[in-house]
Structures are given as C-alpha cells and as structure tokens.
Amino acid sequence: MQIQIVCVGKIKDAYISSGVVEFEKRLRPYGKIFITELAEVKIPDNASASDELRVKEREGELILANVKEGFFKIALDPNGMSLSSEEFSDVFRDAKLSGKNLCFIIGGPLGLSPKLLQSVEKKLSLSRMTFTHPMTRLILLEQVYRAFRILNGEPYHK
Ligand SMILES: C[S@@+](CC[C@H](N)C(=O)[O-])C[C@H]1O[C@@H](n2cnc3c(N)ncnc32)[C@H](O)[C@@H]1O
C-alpha cells in the first residue's frame, strides 16, 4: 500500500521535524509513505475574509494537482469524523483488502477551502481542538504507525 501525505507549509521547529523523521523511519516496514510538502500561498497584508478564501482556494488547487492519481483522499479537518485508533486501523485494513492507496491532506495556517473539503472522500478529525499544521503532521504519522501496529498484532497500542 502507498500512503501519501500532502501538506501545506514547512515545519520550522526542530522538535517536530525530528518526530516526523522518527515516525517516517518506523513506518518504512509497513508500506511506501511519502510526504508532499507544498509552499504556502502568500497571505496579503491586512487580508480580508475574501483574500483568505482566495489563498485557501489556490492552496486547494495546488493540493489536488499534487495528489497521486487514483489515491483515496482523506482530509484532516477538526470538523471531520472522529475515530478510535482501532477504527483508524480498519481504514488501512480495508484499503489493503481493496488494493487502495491513501492520500491524507493537511491544510496550511488558514486551513482547507470548502471546495477542497467537498471534493475529498473522507474528512478525519484528530480532535475537536485545532492543532498547528506541523503538529497535525506529527500526530497523524504517530496514529498511522499505531494503526499498523494494531493491524499486525504488534505491541505498542495500549
Ligand atoms: C492551523 S490548522 C487550520 C485552522 C483553520 N482555522 C481551520 O479551520 O482549518 C491547519 C491544518 O491542520 C489540520 N488540523 C488542525 N487541527 C486538526 C484536528 N484537530 N483534526 C484534524 N486536522 C487538524 C487541518 O488540516 C488544518 O487545515
């Protein structure tokens, strides 16, 4: 199975980057995981709500242009569905059984556009609280790792 994570914006904090590198390494035995990091679209000074919407829409277009052909799209969204870690591991079991590849999408500082959120197959919430986009990347990777450990009956999840 291939897993793509498309995200907008760089990680600036070393403590998050090293966590991301660690979980990418731990995930290597379970499939091809690759991260597509896109540059943030510049937010104009004193941006109005419509300027911000334009930024999110442009980022949404760039995201969709970078999703690998045929991948099942899951957007990370605080208002999406919430799953237990066991239920999240079922997402990978089902994808494996049906031969699907998955693409997780993380927005930039302004979030994802309504158009993008309408175009994806699923929306996943990690919590009703809002995280920074780098933190979301790290938490998602840890949960993907946890899901594979659960799926394979390997120790980690308690
Ligand atoms: C700083 S947040 C954007 C906040 C923005 N106000 C919004 O409504 O999406 C950046 C990105 O991180 C992801 N994110 C943040 N918190 C999340 C959560 N609790 N669950 C899922 N994704 C989250 C989303 O993909 C979001 O677009």
From Swiss-Prot:
Which is an annotated Pfam family here?
A: SPOUT_MTase
Q: What is its EC number?
A: 2.1.1.177
Query: Which reaction is recorded as catalysed by this protein?
Result: pseudouridine(1915) in 23S rRNA + S-adenosyl-L-methionine = N(3)-methylpseudouridine(1915) in 23S rRNA + S-adenosyl-L-homocysteine + H(+)
The compartments listed are: Cytoplasm
Q: Which GO terms describe its molecular function?
A: rRNA (pseudouridine-N3-)-methyltransferase activity
Top enzyme class, one word, equals transferase
Predominant cellular place of this UniProt entry's protein? cytoplasm
**Coiled-coil region:** none
Q: Provide the residue positions that the database annotates as binding S-adenosyl-L-methionine.
A: L76, G107, L126, S127, R128, M129, T130, F131
Kindly state which keywords UniProt assigns to this record, in alphabetical order.
Cytoplasm, Methyltransferase, rRNA processing, S-adenosyl-L-methionine, Transferase
Q: Does the keyword Methyltransferase apply?
A: yes
Q: Which InterPro entries match?
A: Alpha/beta_knot_MTases, RlmH-like, tRNA_m1G_MTases_N
Gene Ontology CC terms, in alphabetical order: cytoplasm
* Stated role: Specifically methylates the pseudouridine at position 1915 (m3Psi1915) in 23S rRNA.
What NCBIfam families does this protein's entry cite?
A: PRK00103.1-3
Q: Which family does it belong to?
A: Belongs to the RNA methyltransferase RlmH family.
Can you say what this protein is called? Putative ribosomal RNA large subunit methyltransferase H
Q: Which organism is it from?
A: Methanocorpusculum labreanum (strain ATCC 43576 / DSM 4855 / Z)
Q: Which gene encodes it?
A: rlmH
